[in-house]
C-alpha cells in the first residue's frame, strides 16, 4: 500500500491496513499469528535476558 501510494501519510495507511485486518477470518490471520509466535520464540532463545525498555 505504501509503495502504491508513496505520498500517503503513515497514519492513513495504518488505518486502512487495520480495517483490512479486521475483515480477515481467523483462518486467514493464522499464518501471521503463527509466524509471530515463531519469531517471538526465536528472539527469546537468542536474547534470553532481553527486557523491553522504552
UniProtKB/Swiss-Prot annotation:
SMART domains: HMG. GO terms for cellular component: nucleus. The keyword Methyltransferase does not apply. It comes from the Eukaryota. InterPro entries: HMG_box_dom, HMG_box_dom_sf, SRY-related_HMG-box_TF-like. It is found in: Nucleus. This is SRY-related protein AMA1.
Amino acid at each position: 500500500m505504501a509503495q502504491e501510494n508513496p505520498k500517503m501519510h503513515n497514519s492513513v495507511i495504518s488505518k486502512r491496513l487495520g480495517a483490512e485486518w479486521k475483515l480477515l477470518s481467523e483462518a486467514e490471520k493464522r499464518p501471521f499469528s503463527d509466524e509471530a509466535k515463531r519469531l517471538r520464540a526465536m528472539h527469546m532463545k537468542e536474547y534470553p535476558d532481553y527486557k523491553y525498555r522504552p
